[in-house]
Curated annotation (Swiss-Prot):
It comes from Nostoc punctiforme (strain ATCC 29133 / PCC 73102). Its cofactor is Zn(2+). Keywords: DNA damage, DNA repair, DNA-binding, Glycosidase, Hydrolase, Lyase, Metal-binding, Multifunctional enzyme, Zinc, Zinc-finger. The active site is at 2 (schiff-base intermediate with dna), 3 (proton donor), 60 (proton donor), 270 (proton donor). The gene is mutM. InterPro entries: DNA_glyclase/AP_lyase_DNA-bd, DNA_glyclase_Znf_dom_DNA_BS, Formamido-pyr_DNA_Glyclase, FPG_cat, MutM-like_N-ter, Ribosomal_uS13-like_H2TH, Znf_DNA_glyclase/AP_lyase, Znf_FPG/IleRS. GO terms for biological process: base-excision repair. A zinc finger (FPG-type) spans 246-280. It catalyses: Hydrolysis of DNA containing ring-opened 7-methylguanine residues, releasing 2,6-diamino-4-hydroxy-5-(N-methyl)formamidopyrimidine; 2'-deoxyribonucleotide-(2'-deoxyribose 5'-phosphate)-2'-deoxyribonucleotide-DNA = a 3'-end 2'-deoxyribonucleotide-(2,3-dehydro-2,3-deoxyribose 5'-phosphate)-DNA + a 5'-end 5'-phospho-2'-deoxyribonucleoside-DNA + H(+). Transmembrane segments: none annotated. This is Formamidopyrimidine-DNA glycosylase. Involved in base excision repair of DNA damaged by oxidation or by mutagenic agents. Acts as a DNA glycosylase that recognizes and removes damaged bases. Has a preference for oxidized purines, such as 7,8-dihydro-8-oxoguanine (8-oxoG). Has AP (apurinic/apyrimidinic) lyase activity and introduces nicks in the DNA strand. Cleaves the DNA backbone by beta-delta elimination to generate a single-strand break at the site of the removed base with both 3'- and 5'-phosphates. Monomer. Pfam families: Fapy_DNA_glyco, H2TH, zf-FPG_IleRS. Its EC number is 3.2.2.23, 4.2.99.18.
Length: 291
């Protein structure tokens, strides 16, 4: 699933390509992709003749502010497992997994391509609170790049939780936008084993973890995100972070720090990658080796 860096990469690309451009029409090829409104015709009518004022990101959600002479509405997108937003000329052949097409001037269009069909798109009418339609937004924790994401904030989210830190980091009510890839990477950078219980973490470890989360996300955004399966940016280009990942998807390969084989285990049904030499239950003493 695309995580914060991949969604941020898409947001930046959309702002470069679609800003101030008017949506001239739309075509929905798979009705269930449209989460709201329930009428596909109402969705197409709602977005037509609206210009893209800007694209925002909240966690893994993309939100386009749509402006018309009389009102402001919103377009929401969640890529889920395999969703892609691709900026293409209208003459480009349709991919068989194309679900929604948004038409713009100069024969350009924005296509939502989604192999697994889990992705969703919303149109929020003028005067309606975005969170009342895209209800997942109200459950999101602070964004890692927001001022709210302090050591104290993260500590308050983790304290008294008797579950593994890796599992907690995947909870969008703990950290918005983090997923399997960057949870593994941040835990390696902070020297903490994924099975460590949240309740056992010291404040110093949480401080290191917060810093590591921000660092790995920034590094991945600079690399254009990670492509292990389906992710592409709006121009159809792969992300490059996978080539420099510390542990994710590297089971059996030598650790980039100590040379020991990277291990993989299952936690709450998800794969977790780590180095048993560089990561410990306490974690703090190993941190300096990755700076």
């Amino acid at each position: 699933m695309p995580e914060l860096p991949e969604v941020e990469t898409v947001r930046k690309g959309l702002n470069q390509l679609t800003l101030n451009q008017e949506i001239t029409g739309g075509d929905v090829l798979l009705n269930r992709t449209i989460a709201y409104p329930f009428s596909v015709g109402e969705f197409v009518d709602g977005i037509e003749k609206n210009a893209i004022a800007t694209w925002h990101r909240r966690g893994k959600y993309l939100l386009a502010e749509l402006s018309s002479p009389c009102s402001t509405s919103w377009l929401g997108v969640h890529l889920r497992m395999t969703g892609q937003l691709l900026w293409l000329h209208r003459d480009e052949p349709l991919h068989k997994h194309t679900r929604v097409r948004l038409f713009f001037g100069d024969q350009q269009e924005l296509r939502f391509v989604d192999q697994r069909t889990f992705g969703k798109i919303w149109w929020v009418p003028p005067g309606v609170a975005v969170e009342s339609i895209i209800t997942g937004l109200a459950k999101l924790a602070a964004d890692p790049f927001s001022p709210e994401f302090s050591v104290e904030y993260l500590a308050s989210k983790l304290k008294n939780r008797r579950r593994p830190i890796k599992t907690a980091l995947l909870d969008q009510s703990v950290v918005a936008g983090l997923g399997n890839i960057y949870a593994d990477e941040a835990l390696f950078k902070s020297g903490i084993l994924p099975e460590t219980l949240c309740i056992d973490l010291q404040l110093k470890q949480i401080e290191l973890l917060r810093t590591a989360i921000i660092q790995v996300l920034e590094t991945s955004i600079e690399a254009g995100g990670t492509t292990f399966s389906n992710f592409l940016n709006v121009k159809g280009t792969n992300g490059n972070y996978g080539g420099v990942a510390w542990v994710y998807n590297r089971a059996g390969e030598p650790c980039r720090v100590c040379g020991m084989p990277i291990q993989r285990i299952r936690l709450a049904g998800r794969s977790s990658h780590f180095c048993s030499e560089c990561q410990t239950l306490r974690g703090v003493e190993n941190r300096e080796r990755r700076d």
